[in-house]
Amino acid sequence: DLWKSEHSSSFTAMRSRGGGFSSTQFVDQLGVLGPDCHVAHGVYMRADDRRRLRARQTAVALCPRSNRVIGLDAPPVGAYLAEGNMIAVGTDSLSSSPSLDLLEDVALLFDLARSQGYEDQDLARRLLQAATLGGATAMGLATGPDRLGQLQSGAVADMCVVDVPVTSIVETIDTVARHGAGRV
């Protein structure tokens, strides 16, 4: 259980007796962080770790349903958004997630961000951007002739249709983010 909760006694004891730096600081000292690297899950990132990821242009792929299955805490999605970190949305795999429906993870991230105090009205748009361009960026596929994750002249047409009622642009984006799961 020592790796499952930042607040467990074994985790805090290990951190207090560690080498004086986080795993993010450690891999940064090795020169690993950068735009050609992404962090999976990003659950136990403190403010300094998040700042370091921003400084190195390293994206974080958030997989909140997988975190629940394997017993991890929720990612600090509200902090990532408020502080301007590059995020992507992931499902992990069927070995640790009930399905590969990316929009289920988007909906959960929406609820988590709100519960963590992120109140900006851009939440749905930013999470859908994380699920599209954010994912392409994290995988190094957002630039070049075969770029993905964006509707743009010259980009690869990699699209899906989500069956939701179309109202205003803002309301439709909100509906896709919060209720689009299972409607692709």
At which residue positions do the language-model features occur?
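C-terminal cap of metal-dependent C-N hydrolases
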Residues: 156-184
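Short beta-alpha connecting loops at secondary-structure transitions
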Residues: 88-94, 112-123, 175
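Alpha-helix capping/termination and helix-coil
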Residues: 31, 81-87, 110-117, 131-143
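Histidine/acidic residue-rich metal-binding segments in metalloenzymes
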Residues: 1-59, 71-87, 146
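Divalent metal-coordination and catalytic microenvironments
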Residues: 39, 53, 60, 92, ...
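Active-site beta-loop-alpha junctions enriched in small/polar residues
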Residues: 42-45, 65-67, 92-94
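Short acidic/histidine-rich active-site segments
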Residues: 70-73, 80-104, 151-157
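Mid-to-C-terminal alpha-helical segments outside catalytic/metal-binding sites
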Residues: 126, 133-137, 141-145, 153-159, ...
